[in-house]
Amino acid sequence: MEAVNPVVLGQTRAKQYFHNDKERKKVIPLLIHGDAAFAGQGVVAECFAMAGLKGHNTGGTIHIIVNNQIGFTTSPRFARSSPYPSDLGKIVEAPILHCNGDDPEAVVHCAKIAIEFRQKFNKDVVIDAVSYTHLTLPTKA
């Protein structure tokens, strides 16, 4: 699910190179994650770890977590040891914005803040859009 992340970051870096975008302002990488995949797949942490390297830096990525609180039909308390899936963003001291995923205006507000921060500081930003599964999924307890 998260295998596309390094591909997107590489494409972003290439477009910045070919547009002579040395300030990394013209092309912004945007990654959309599920809550369990963001916290549970190592490729996200690897991308965070490489973000600060000169040859891999894209000027910051905007990460949006679509957090339905039941990733892969697993309750959050069994899926990770931290309270929020977005805690992984603390690795690079990224600001983490939590919002109600069922309130489009709240999500847009967070997105505007994220873009402004990214453009000003050239750092990653994480938006945790918390929602819930409206139709229950069959699971075993």
Protein language model annotation of sequence segments:
Residues A14, F121, K140-A141:
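Generic hydrophobic alpha-helical segments
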Residues P76-A79, I96-V126, S131:
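Conserved phosphate-handling catalytic cores of large alpha/beta enzymes
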Residues D87, V108-K112, T139:
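A broad detector of short, well-ordered amphipathic alpha-helices
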Residues G52, E116-Q119, P138-T139:
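Charged, amphipathic alpha-helical interaction segments
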Residues T133-A141:
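Conserved small/polar residues in nucleotide/adenosyl-binding loops
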